[in-house]
């Protein structure tokens, strides 16, 4: 599920909610 956040230059801020970077977009 996309978290509505990109992770091209910075890590996923939403990572604290279980999201991770995949193909430059944060997914949960």
UniProtKB/Swiss-Prot annotation:
Pfam families: Cyclotide. Expressed in fruit, pedicel and stem but not in leaf and root (at protein level). Disulfide bonds join 3-19, 7-21, 12-26. PROSITE patterns: CYCLOTIDE, CYCLOTIDE_BRACELET. The keyword Nucleus does not apply. Keywords: Antibiotic, Antimicrobial, Cytolysis, Disulfide bond, Hemolysis, Knottin, Oxidation, Plant defense. The modification Methionine sulfoxide is found at residue 16. The keyword Disulfide bond applies. GO terms for biological process: defense response to Gram-positive bacterium; killing of cells of another organism. The presence of a 'disulfide through disulfide knot' structurally defines this protein as a knottin. Chassatide C11: Probably participates in a plant defense mechanism. Active against E.coli ATCC 25922 (MIC=8.5 uM) but not against S.aureus ATCC 12600 or S.epidermidis ATCC 14990. Has cytotoxic and hemolytic activity. Chassatide C11A: Probably participates in a plant defense mechanism. Has no activity against bacteria up to a concentration of 80 uM. Has no cytotoxic and no hemolytic activity. Belongs to the cyclotide family. Bracelet subfamily. This is Chassatide C11.
